[in-house]
A protein has these predicted regions:
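Solvent-exposed amphipathic alpha-helical surface segments
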Residues: 121-126, 193
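Hydrophobic "anchor" residues on beta-strands that sit immediately upstream
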Residues: 146
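Active-site nucleotide/adenylate-binding loops and adjacent lid/helix of ATP-dependent enzymes
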Residues: 1-67, 101-117
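A short glycine-rich, hydrophobically flanked beta-strand micro-motif that places a catalytic Asp/Glu
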Residues: 38-39, 50, 126-143
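ATP-dependent carboxylate/phosphate-activation module, predominantly the ATP-grasp catalytic core
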Residues: 51-122, 152-183
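Cysteine/selenocysteine-centered motifs that mediate thiol-based redox chemistry or coordinate metal-sulfur cofactors
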Residues: 180-200
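A generic structural micro-environment signature
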Residues: 15, 44-48, 71, 75, ...
Length: 200
């Protein structure tokens, strides 16, 4: 069973045909399909923006950016359109890794605002709010609109950020990942006798 059995459709008839085919092949179960969500596919560049919120100083650190590598969609998209049409193979979005990314500087302010806005919203709705790392999985459209389509509230499985991101270096003078940022937070909380503020 796939962790995420995504598939794309262009109409209700297409949905019925593809879902029945996947049920017959055992890729998805009918009972799971009945609970599934249907989402609009946003066309643009997909990026994961990784942040860290520290309650100690109530600031949001921007840790870095990466992109998912997915099979078989990524390599399939590298083929010329004519070959794609001739091959007629089923596409899947199975995550197999990550690749580092950056963003043009004129868009950075939008990224920072997204992180700050998310932290404020979570604090308002679910006190005490987000503590530690989170990732805003986003797409940037052709109009440079940033759409967050999913949120990851955990230590991201992308160790490449620790060695490739320039953003922690701008703020702290060195490049590091989420693990070291968590360690820095714990050390500071212990030194200031505020450990209860970062654990639940």
């Amino acid at each position: 069973m796939l962790e995420r059995a995504f598939f794309t459709v262009t109409s209700y008839a297409d949905y019925k045909e593809k879902s029945e085919e996947k049920i017959k092949k055992g890729i998805i179960a009918r009972k799971d399909l009945e609970k599934a969500s249907i989402e609009e596919l946003a066309i643009g560049t997909y990026l994961n923006f990784n942040f860290f919120h520290t309650p100690i100083s109530d600031q949001v650190d921007f840790i870095g950016i990466e992109r998912r590598l997915q099979t078989n969609i990524h390599d399939y998209n590298a083929l010329p359109a004519k070959q794609q049409l001739e091959m007629d193979i089923p596409l899947q979005n199975i995550e197999v890794g990550h690749t580092p990314a950056s963003i043009r500087e004129s868009l950075l302010e939008k990224v920072f605002k997204m992180g700050d806005k998310f932290v404020r919203a979570v604090k308002k709705e679910y006190a005490p709010g987000i503590i530690g790392p989170f990732s805003l999985q986003s797409v940037i459209t052709k109009d440079l609109e940033m759409i967050v389509y999913d949120v990851s509230l955990r230590v991201p499985g992308n160790p490449i950020v620790a060695t490739t991101s320039p953003y922690t270096k701008y703020q702290y003078g060195t490049t590091f990942g989420i693990g070291r940022r968590i360690a820095m937070e714990i050390k500071r909380a212990v030194e200031e006798d505020r450990i209860k503020e970062i654990v639940t």
